[in-house]
């Protein structure tokens, strides 16, 4: 019989799936608990930040995710013959456990809250088949649970950008060239739909901005987006390729993780590499390097990047801000030819 995992948050037991409190320490002392721990190799400790975010912002789905983690961890450790091999890691919507497969292969078990963005992740990973990205080993459709190849979570490109921004941007450019060479599979969300939503949201967002110059800037970015929105493209986009989503690997030096896949124009992919690790004066050469390596038409890439600026600005306004983010303003001014 499968045991329920000993799941802790900051060393304290969390509720089990049936709503009862789970005594992790007591469980670990029982015969059943010791047998379970021999299989998984460790107590699974859930990062408190993940729990807090899901309970505060995730609504019913977030609470269900947290309460279901003990049973879900146990289910997939047993189903896929896995043993926990280290402390849990997390993003805002996912728990990642380093594991070892029955044959000794290192892997990562990713349990996440299913949503529109995460639903496309296995589709994209299968299409890329490890070319420039983490390799998908197993996938459960109903829960969205993934088993991925193990990368080095302690070595990501964010560390390199601080020392050598040009080298880091070159890595991202090379990955984008490979990833966007693949045509998007049928059924993925399209950039045309996203662009239409952005354009529809600009008038209200601009009206909330305190500065007239920023209102004009946002509208000008939207005008550039409108020029290309009718031809959204058909490439498989990562949509979140910032430096923290590029990890060191063994079979390749750097590989992309955590895609939020979209079918569209590769020009929509550039902004994270322009604003992450931002330094004034670097926007121009970063844009030149990215468009050159990926092989993009500069004018279309400029317009789609300004569209991505619109997206980030709308998110800020939705969160109650009345001023545009400084990094996005700097990028927009360079691409619109207004930088001093």
Curated annotation (Swiss-Prot):
Its EC number is 2.7.-.-. The keyword ATP-binding applies. Disulfide bonds: none annotated. Keywords: ATP-binding, Kinase, Nucleotide-binding, Transferase. GO terms for molecular function: ATP binding; kinase activity; phosphotransferase activity, alcohol group as acceptor. The keyword Nucleotide-binding applies. One of its GO terms (biological process) is secondary metabolic process. Pfam families: APH_6_hur (PF04655). InterPro entries: Kinase-like_dom_sf, NH2Glyco/OHUrea_AB-resist_kin. The active site is at residue 240. It comes from the Bacteria. Potential phosphotransferase that inactivates hydroxyurea by phosphorylation of the hydroxy group in the hydroxylamine moiety. Belongs to the aminoglycoside phosphotransferase family. This is Hydroxyurea phosphotransferase. It comes from Kitasatospora aureofaciens.
